[in-house]
Structures are given as structure tokens and as C-alpha cells.
Amino acid sequence: MTIFQGKSGKKATGGSLKQSRKKRRFELGREPTLTKLGTKTERKVIRTMGGNTKVILFTAETANVYDASEKKIKKAKIITVKANPANSHYVQRNIINKGTVIATEIGDAVVTSRPGQDGVINAKLLK
């Protein structure tokens, strides 16, 4: 299913706009990919506008965590989702997106990548 991202058919006053053309394919978008915490990693590569590709991450169990004090990147297992500034209900559903605070084996980290579009979870360790 797609989402229409073009202009709505209403004016600011509530009146109807006269349609000058039909809806176009470039005005369509996708449903959001809600990356969840799982026991295995599931990805899918999709084609986007201009023949480019996006890697959708459906479930993830590990994250690439950057430790600023040691200046090293470590692969760590994700334990749970602690906080999510995008939506507070995402915490109990264990949904991970950019800005989410996750608990890992190394410690708490904030997600810096966009898992639904990058296909990987990169995070920065919080101290």
C-alpha cells in the first residue's frame, strides 16, 4: 500500500481545490518501516526513484556502537529499547528508529542511523 504525498484536495479555508491533473507516481510514498528488536536480522533491498536502492531493516538483534572514549566501533547485542523521542508507544513495542535510546551489552546508546532506510543500526555510546 502507498501513501499520497501530494497536495490535498482542500484549501486552507476548507473549500475544494479544482483538480488540474491526476495523481502522479512520483507523489506516492511508502508505509513507514518499523524496525523491531528480534532474534535474527531481516533485510530487504527495494528500488527507489531514479533506480537507486534502499535497504529496509525489518528486525535487528545487534548494533554497531561507537565508543568515543576509546575511538572504536564495537558490535553489540541490543537488549531492549529504553526511550524513543519519535513516539513514546514505540518503547513498549521495541521499535527502533533514529534518536532511539537502546540498552546494549556495552551500555546505553543512541541510534544515529535510519534503520528503515540504511539497513543497519549505528549507535553512539552514552556516557
From Swiss-Prot:
GO terms for molecular function: structural constituent of ribosome. Pfam families: Ribosomal_S8e (PF01201). Keywords: Ribonucleoprotein, Ribosomal protein. Transmembrane segments: none annotated. Belongs to the eukaryotic ribosomal protein eS8 family. Part of the 30S ribosomal subunit. This is Small ribosomal subunit protein eS8. It comes from Thermoplasma acidophilum (strain ATCC 25905 / DSM 1728 / JCM 9062 / NBRC 15155 / AMRC-C165).
